[in-house]
Structure formats: structure tokens, C-alpha cells
């Protein structure tokens, strides 16, 4: 007998192919143009080589995420896995570093909106577009407005179309002239050597954010325990190969002297390569699609981090005013304004600096997931009940250790300034732990990362099913 009060159950309709496609679209192929100029300058035009290294490193990490999903077949995150494997303090610090990522993600979207719109309307400064985007997202967040899901689907569809046309134009340009083109050269280390390629690959970690989003579909998968781990690995591989293809095609067709370009030219390189290959109309189409997508991503990131700050304020881990809700709309207005004030840094930071900071947090979280596999499977709490098999040792010991080593290698390839900011942020996290635990005498409270990096649909559902509770200002 069905009761009207029972919540509707999600239909288990997604197989391996559907889950993989979700993961690839969540990563967004057009992301390759976010750091197109930055990484090409760092690697002296060897972006495909950097992507290849990044894909190899990410496949090991994806395998670790897949292993953790098998153990915890629910939507999880690096914070969840670290907290379960190593306890509250390690989990909190991992979550704290992830929070740094969440704070910078809206910022980089605002910056890109300003940079790209300025290429079409050069009379208006970059900072004006950036500030307007920031204020609009803040307003929408306070009012509780989110983008319609159909618009997100349209942006994804247009992005895929754009990339397909771009690759076709790039190959036509590369092979349509009389100049001989080297197919292999973009995959070599170049004069900068493996160090430059590693630095580029470290920045590209931000291209893979969200590859684990497949884990949120556990209730909609036909065979979640089997298919979701596979889909995580397949979506990482497929998305990575698409990144390599796009960067390779662009590198064959457009080879400027990257070291001689100005900072502004480097940041807007994605627009420049579109203009060279497709002309003004194609470039305008690219900018329109990219800006709308960046605006949606900025909104999603803003809502996500505002709710995390709200929860931390509510639980006493951060100042209580962060838990204040707007009287009329019930949204975390103080937290939203705090995120926007932080995002004002976009007016004077470089795109490269922000990209490095996002990669710092991402790589730190990835490293902890790799360690969590080793701890969970080889050294479980309460001890092992049976001997370790060779297969288990290779899958849950050697593979995640390689993933950890590769991640740390890329992590150490980031700029020194990035490490300084990251170290200060971690130190603040340790101080917070000391305060909320009364000098490490009480257990470390859990952070509310239940939503991870939610999609717009998830945010809509969150607002309907789990309205925020708290003091209304």
C-alpha cells in the first residue's frame, strides 16, 4: 500500500553510458579555454603534453575515488572520505582547503566574464564587467534565483557544438596550407623540460573539478555499486582525451610566440584563437556561450560556498553572523555578501594567480583521497580480518600510492606564492580547530559538505526540500 506522505523514489534508469556522459558534461569541455593561454605560456606551446600528464595523474585519482565509492556508495567528497579514514582533524583540514577552492571558483568566473566581454567591447574596462557580474550573482543569490535547468542543458549543447566546429576549423587551418605541421611536437617537453610540463599540468587540475559528480547519481543508476566507479574512471578518461584533442588541434593551427605575449593577451588567448580560426562571428558566438556558462557556474559556486559558510557559522566554527538569513527570502545573506567581498579580489588579482589557488586546493583534496584508499582498504579501523591479496595490494596500495605521488609532484610544481597563501589558510584552519575543540580537548565538529559541488538542479532541490533554518535578520 502506498502512502501519500512517502517521498517519490528516483527511477533507476541510468546505465554505464548515461553515467559516463553525465560525468563528461559536468566537467564541461569548453573549460579547456579557461587556462588556454596561461598553460601554453608556462609550457611554451606544449599544452597537449601538459594535459597528457594531467590525465595520467587524474586517472589514478579517479580510480581512488571509484574505490571509495565502492566502500561508501553514496554521494561523497574528499572531505567525507578523509574524515572517515583519518578522523575529524584531517577531515576538517581537507574540507578547509576545499573551502578555499569554493571561494575562488566564483571569482575566476567573474574574471573570465570581464576578460572575454572586454575583447568584444574594448571601450569598457575589464573590471566593470567583472564587478557587474559579481553584483548580479550576489543579487540573484540573495533573492534565491537560480538558472533554469533547460538553460544549463542548452549551454552544454552549444559548448559541445562549439568545440566540434573549433576542432574542424583547427585541422582545416593546420593542414590546409603549404607549411609542414609536426603532429608530435606539441606532445614533447620542449625547452622548458618536464618541469614546465608539470607546472602546466598542475594548473590543469582545475579542468577536472567535478569528475566525481557521478557519485551523486547513486539513486538513479541501475547498478550503482558496479557502474558508478566505472563511470568515474571513464568520464575522467573521456573528458581528458577531449581536452587533449582540443588543445592539440588548437596548437597545430595557432602557434604564436607565447613568451612574448602580454598578460592581457595571455588571459584572452581563448578568444584570440577563436578569432584566428573562425572570424568575428564565430568568436562572438564563443564569447556569448562562454560568458553565459561562466555566469551560471559563478552562481552555482556562490550558492554552494554561501551555504557552507552558513552551516559553519551555525555550528560555531566560524563567526555566528554568517548564519543570519535574510528576513524576506530566507537566504544566507551575510554569507553571500562575505563571498562577494572575497570575490572583489578579482579586481586586482591575475587569472593565473587564481587558477593556481584553485589547483592548490584541488590537488590537496585529490592527494587525501588517494591516501584514504590505502588507509581504508589496507589498514582499516579495527584491524584486518583476512590477509592482503596481491590483487588488493596492487589495487588499493600501489595504484593510490602512485596517484598520491603524482598529485604531490604536481602540487609542488605550483608557484611559491600559491604555497604561501595555502600555508596561511591551513594555519588558520588549525587555529579554528584549536578554538572549537577547546585546545584539542573535544572532538572536531563535522563540516557540512553534504552538497559537495551541487549542480543547479541540486541547488533547486536543496532549496525546496531542505530550506535553511536560522535567525532571520
Positions of PLM-derived features:
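Membrane-interface "cap" regions at the ends of multi-pass membrane proteins
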Residues: 1-37, 41-46, 58-63, 75, ...
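C-terminal membrane-solvent junction of multi-pass transporters and transport-like membrane proteins
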Residues: 17, 151, 321-330, 366-419, ...
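Helix-loop-helix junctions that connect adjacent transmembrane segments
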Residues: 5-10, 44-48, 52, 125, ...
